[in-house]
Amino acid sequence: ENTKGQITAIDLFPKMITLLKERAIHHGLSDRISGIAVSMENLPFEPGELDLIWPEGSIYNIGFERGLREWKQFLKPGGMIAVSEVSWLTNTRPDEIEQFWNFNYAEIDTISNKIKKMEEAGYTPVAHFILPEYCWLDCFYKPMQENIPLFLEKYKNSKPAQQLVQRELDEIDYYRKYKSYYGYVFYIGMKNE
């Protein structure tokens, strides 16, 4: 609603694209918003086609460095990338949380190192900021917790489903305990000419 630009959303799951299209129609935006069910590892864009790539909370699926490198080709000269990425907020931290994240996402790193990796991938860093705590608790973990009973019911309370739920609950506990050491950081970079 706040831009006149054309937006192409991607998601691996066709159901999410269907939902996007329904919402775009509902809001009168279907002439500017389209969706494609595709993997971010196989994007269907032409070199230099896009002004902006904005993988909100998802670049970790293929890795920060790989995403920056591979997606750069799709940006026009001076095009922008805007990514949110889990990052260390301190240079030192308790072993327990370091081990947890190194096991779950080995590319976690400090903000300064993430910015350096952005530069090495051919971008000029424009800005970065730490997302507020409510983004984790209210926008991510709360809906996740609310859906746990339905998830367990859907998968008949199977052992694998229970284990997955426990991993998610452990992650929530780790965040509450160690949120001063890590968070999601929003990085904005401009493709170098």
Where do the protein language model's features map onto the residues?
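Class I SAM-dependent methyltransferase SAM/SAH-binding core
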Residues: 1-42
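A short hydrophobic/small-residue beta-strand
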Residues: 7, 81-82
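A short acidic, Gly/Pro-enriched loop at the edge of an enzyme's catalytic core
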Residues: 41-53
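A short SAM/SAH-binding and catalytic strip from SAM-dependent methyltransferases
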Residues: 51-65
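A short glycine-rich, Lys/Arg-flanked "PGG" loop and its adjoining helix->strand segment in the class I
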Residues: 65-80
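Short, glycine-/aromatic-enriched active-site segment of Class I SAM-dependent methyltransferases
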Residues: 86-105
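Short alpha-helix
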Residues: 106-128
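Conserved Class I S-adenosyl-L-methionine
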Residues: 127-193
